[in-house]
């Protein structure tokens, strides 16, 4: 196998046994693909499909005027280039967006003839549309945001029941609901009396037949739709009915049923079963005489006209009187509805009988009254309202997804129409749709069919960025449409252009609102690469059109069988959002309809193929899916007699030939974060949940350290997160320094006519959203060959292209003097000295100079009443130097604000006129370092309002940026010239000269001669061969063009920098100062492993006091062994043992290198590690000796191992590795007390565990209040660090003081220290005067209590006096 640039340097031994059928997909595709399809930017306007933006425009245009004489048509849209790139937008605090222009055609028709009179086409500016960065984020107002995908109920039709909770009888009431993508909901529901009702948009309920009447059906038609008819014959005074034996099955015989000979087949009162049915069929019975009573309560199926013209209406209940009328009226035959109590209920007929509306108009009026209560109904209004509810494509859209789900649920065939017309037709409801839903509901009530499970992932779909932006865009366009319609009638007369008609503000506002303040547009979690990736792969059930925390029940939050391979069962927040916010599984993706799919291998006749098929939860129904680790022989046949499979949501065992699919990978079930936990299969799920969540809070350490025990997913996460620099094309490293890499691209990857230079500028010490530090470090060397996709530089928390969130620590599981009580962690001072858990945090402090009523604020070093020492770190412009070390209270930016003019005496005026004394009328409002902060200034940015003169500092910053850019361009041109020179020498070599340059006519051009000449001289040579001369001219022209292009780029950059910045109104200048703070680990900081084993650092011990082994090697960290059994996360122990083996092997390799063993011996030892102890085999023979030495050098700190989730290392393999590393197979070591040198009683588990430092640092939490703000109502101090609040002295603390009888302390707590307003001012004064005397008064909360009681109507007064 071929190794990449970084893999060669450090191969991770993989214990996985299962073959890799497919690589993990690109992890951000759900975001990137969704937005790409929405914009369709790369496609030409002619080839754009009807999706995304195109669909939004198509659905609103054409817009016609009310008279129909003018119309606006949409032709195409185009996106311009964004003004600034992503980094510039983040610095300037602007939005990364592209201007959108839309070509609109205005058509004006002649009023009389309706022929086209005039056509005008014009491009209209429609505002800016935010662009997605290549890593799936948006930059909105300078901050990176993520749009989280939403998991919502799919449009379609759903059948459900209330589980007997609505009615006191406990009767199960069924209901059906049609949910469109946009428009009114239509619900049908049964009540306890078995009548069917309808609700529109959850309004007051109506009888369902009202809607059927409104659709234009009469009684007979309605009965016809829902029931079969049963003919009744009146013959010689007795009634006969057609006998269909199958229909009678299950009914109770109300009379003896006899055959033609009079032999009884079924006795009265017996239930008719299958045997009786067979006997009746054998007897050949076709008619059955029935007594009159049998027909009582039956229902007439149609109107029956008697002799005398009297009509017995359809849906009449037969009774003795009606039967007599029928007999007298000479009716020989009539139809009744076939109903019974078992599976043919008379629900619709009963509802129809209860319905008081007689015709369509009455029904429409009834619906109008419900929808618009209080408005007087007119015939037209009622008609329009009903039509607009479900039958107008403007107001109602089921969407292709909804139509697919609808037809599928009702068992109809489904083909989706792609063109706009068929989309509109399929988007609205038809009469048949409504009838079919009602019919299905009645059948479910009759006991046929099942209700739906709304938590099934076939009934929930994912709405991603693209779709949500499209919806917002449509909302904006609809607002535009309303305004345009008003103006179009003017356009007919006033000769307006499209530009005059369209006001794009509503569109821009809708988009801005969505990206800026929607619940699903979130501030990106940028703690580390993993937290970024997880945030982008999150699916939330909350948000607009979704659930709310309070309403969501237990079922919605629970793990459902369809989550398998689609949504992670582990990773979800603890707390009120549990189960509502989920994470996509590693291999999951959303299909075109938005349903989540997961890949499976196809299995044919018990043989597993390599064909991979993505199945959604809907398609998975009925399949039989084997586990990824099912036993398979070398030909791919399943070998077990019964294979463990998943079928219909159950785990069962089936023979191999029944199996249809097989899992692709063992990691398929879990999300990215969970798949990074080694030995996840040995951890309790609750702890694994904490582990996945805490990995996202890990702070990038100063030097990233790859995990010794990983899972093999680390490289994928680092690569896909976008924090590393990845080579776009292969080539040779031409130049490299700390902040840039220049690559000369391979010839075969170059596009004709380009320089073949790729320049990568690295991000250095930049602030992330969470104030952690983003910094990239080069890992390539000059002259190295790299291929496309290789990692060139590591980002934060990555090491050689692998995710590295923490540090490998030598841990011992033992108690140590109570310092690890309750999960506390005891650390060694060595960790501190080596800066292993030190992180850099960057704070942004900004100073804004505004234009005030009294004059402009000024940024200056001339500050009144400030000593020389305080200004020592500022330059002439009053801005701090880069590199200055500042502490709390230091001035960063000097700023003065004008004060109100005071009345001056004439003498003062004179003095001021003479000496120009101006200091008195300004006050110091400088930006100072906040309390509790100290650090180094690493960057300063100055933004000046357009039209104001820039100060020296701003100009210096601008110059530095230009110089850096010029350097890039020069580098590019230099490589370009070198490439051209090589090409020219290749062309001229061996040719004959025609003179020119330093050659004479007839000279043979040798390589020695040519290689001594510069490019300019080479291009002057005129070769005899004209074809070559032509090529030389081309190269010359090309170089000129390139030079001009580079000059133009530089000029453009200069123009960008020279223009002022767009600042908010009233702001003249903004100075941003970036402070870097180094945070070492200290007691009170929170740390954790990857298995949910979290704790707080309790103490940092000197190295000499730490427990050590017989060789004197001390441990780094002491953990409490009692934290393991009750929490059931045994994975950490296995990780510790395997980590010990990895480190031991590294030590052995280091020893071999020190002893300068031969490469052959090294090869043999590496072969033992990689290929003898199980797992994936590595091809070490493909590496050269130099590469083997480099590899061994990188393995000295430990051999990195991968134990994939659910397919990891076995106990025996861990023991074998320990043995190979010359460590006891038990993994336990005898330790000695560092203080006394005594041996501890029994061997201790010592090994290497990967420990993370979490972003819960004691520095951010330490807080003390002196005097601060108070709550308005209760007058008590506020709570929390952000409000500068006090410590709450709660109910239980009061009990404690009461128990101690500390009366005065208690009085002080409840009065002057809290809410006794007068008392606290008095005591403050007393303390200032040095008189420590307390005079408590009435607490404000007592007054609040009395007011509260009075508000209940009880008068309460406090009597003062005796």
Swiss-Prot record:
* Residue runs in coiled coils: none
Kindly state one GO CC term assigned in the UniProt record: DNA-directed RNA polymerase complex
User: Does the keyword section mention Transferase?
Assistant: yes
Q: Which residues cross the membrane?
A: none
Recorded GO molecular functions are: DNA binding; DNA-directed RNA polymerase activity; ribonucleoside binding
The biological processes this protein is annotated with in GO are:
DNA-templated transcription
**What EC number(s) has UniProt assigned to this enzyme?**
2.7.7.6
| Name of a matching Pfam family | RNA_pol_Rpb2_45
- Catalytic activity, reaction form: RNA(n) + a ribonucleoside 5'-triphosphate = RNA(n+1) + diphosphate
Instruction: Give UniProt keywords alphabetically.
Output: DNA-directed RNA polymerase, Nucleotidyltransferase, Transcription, Transferase
Domain of life, per UniProt, equals: Bacteria
CDD domains listed in its UniProt record: RNA_pol_B_RPB2
Reply yes or no: does the keyword Transferase apply.
yes
What the protein does comes down to: DNA-dependent RNA polymerase catalyzes the transcription of DNA into RNA using the four ribonucleoside triphosphates as substrates.
Give the similarity note.
Belongs to the RNA polymerase beta chain family.
Entry's HAMAP family? RNApol_bact_RpoB
What is its quaternary makeup? The RNAP catalytic core consists of 2 alpha, 1 beta, 1 beta' and 1 omega subunit. When a sigma factor is associated with the core the holoenzyme is formed, which can initiate transcription.
Protein name listed in UniProt: DNA-directed RNA polymerase subunit beta
Which species is listed as the source?
Acinetobacter baumannii (strain SDF)
Q: What is the lineage of its organism?
A: Bacteria, Pseudomonadati, Pseudomonadota, Gammaproteobacteria, Moraxellales
Which gene underlies this protein? rpoB
